Amino acid sequence: MEALVLVGHGSRLPYSKELLVKLAEKVKERNLFPIVEIGLMEFSEPTIPQAVKKAIEQGAKRIIVVPVFLAHGIHTTRDIPRLLGLIEDNHEHHHEHSHHHHHHHHHEHEKLEIPEDVEIIYREPIGADDRIVDIIIDRAFGR
């Protein structure tokens, strides 16, 4: 069985999670994936490991993870793949950048055990899609 996990940044304010919940509901309504979960990078739950675990508990063997970010950044290229167990978790990054940021990542050390028979497919972020251009133009015209 296939699952889709939408991954967002998370925020101290509720809007980020509410948006992801709404998007997940809209995706569910299309009936393309039997399981749709959301996971948040930081500040709120469900965390990314919690979302993946929830999908596995429902019988998912193939988990497609879509980062709901416009562009690649440190979260999509490093933090999320690390949380998904796709890249080695070495702790040298704590020295890479000033520590004012990384104390927010209270989810970072949550360990995710992926069973042997479960495949994780990590996809690209939203990107410079023409459909985004349409939305930008609508917003510019106050629509």
Curated annotation (Swiss-Prot):
Reactions accelerated catalytically: Co-sirohydrochlorin + 2 H(+) = sirohydrochlorin + Co(2+); Ni-sirohydrochlorin + 2 H(+) = sirohydrochlorin + Ni(2+)
GO biological process: anaerobic cobalamin biosynthetic process; methanogenesis
UniProt entry keywords in alphabetical sequence: Cobalamin biosynthesis, Cobalt, Lyase, Metal-binding, Methanogenesis, Nickel
Name of the protein in question: Sirohydrochlorin cobaltochelatase
Binding annotation for substrate: E45, L70, A71, H72, G73, I74, H75
Organism: Methanocaldococcus jannaschii (strain ATCC 43067 / DSM 2661 / JAL-1 / JCM 10045 / NBRC 100440)
Function: Catalyzes the insertion of Co(2+) into sirohydrochlorin as part of the anaerobic pathway to cobalamin biosynthesis. Involved in the biosynthesis of the unique nickel-containing tetrapyrrole coenzyme F430, the prosthetic group of methyl-coenzyme M reductase (MCR), which plays a key role in methanogenesis and anaerobic methane oxidation. Catalyzes the insertion of Ni(2+) into sirohydrochlorin to yield Ni-sirohydrochlorin.
CDD domains: CbiX_SirB_N
Active site: H9 (proton acceptor)
Gene Ontology MF term list: cobalt ion binding; nickel cation binding; sirohydrochlorin cobaltochelatase activity
Pathways involved: Cofactor biosynthesis; adenosylcobalamin biosynthesis; cob(II)yrinate a,c-diamide from sirohydrochlorin (anaerobic route): step 1/10
PANTHER family (UniProt xref): SIROHYDROCHLORIN FERROCHELATASE, CHLOROPLASTIC (PTHR33542:SF3)
Keyword Plastid: no
Subunit-level organization: Homotetramer; dimer of dimers.
Family indicated by similarity: Belongs to the CbiX family. CbiXS subfamily.
EC number: 4.99.1.3, 4.99.1.11
Family annotation (HAMAP family): CbiX
Binding site for Ni(2+): H9, H75
List of residues binding Co(2+): H9, H75
